[in-house]
């Protein structure tokens, strides 16, 4: 990549062809692998889980990351919870990943502050939450920017092999989205061969599920940086 792009690993434990306990173990191993490799953000995106199971998995992931941070103070990885601000707060996650039709980033920040998250007593949490927003149009990107989101994830940029009904936006649309006053991460069909073109179009980084989860993450990070 021409510059050091941000890297965002989005989890999907259902891609592992195992029983549920093994899936959870393998996912936690991938989360640790991503953190050690220097991935900037990890989104726990296990939408099928009941809230109690999601909380349990999130707590395991956060405990794991905190253990890694103890030995590596410069560990950059932040854990975001998909959609569930309540779970993010309850477990001490670093932030939340919102859909475009979720509550606004401003509301999340207000709730976060009222709950006392990120105070010195919880020094492993940020003083302000990391708030990512999924966007599928320039209008949604503009809205995310106006509501003080940390960054927007623009998708799908390229065709995804498992989403025949999802029309890719393409690099031209990504370039237009990147004109907004907010960092943009490109998602959707990202590979090692096309990731460079996303940064050249103005993206601040890339987000992916398969690219990270189905490969050696350390090797992927080295190839991208």
Spell out what each predicted region is.
Residues 117-118:
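Glycine-biased, low-complexity coil/linker segments
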Residues 155:
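Flexible, gly/ser-rich surface segments that form the specificity/activation loops bordering the active-site cleft
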Residues 161:
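Conserved beta-loop-beta/alpha segment of the NTase-like Rossmann-fold superfamily
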Residues 204-208:
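Acidic, Mg2+-coordinating phosphoryl-transfer loop and its flanking beta/alpha structural elements
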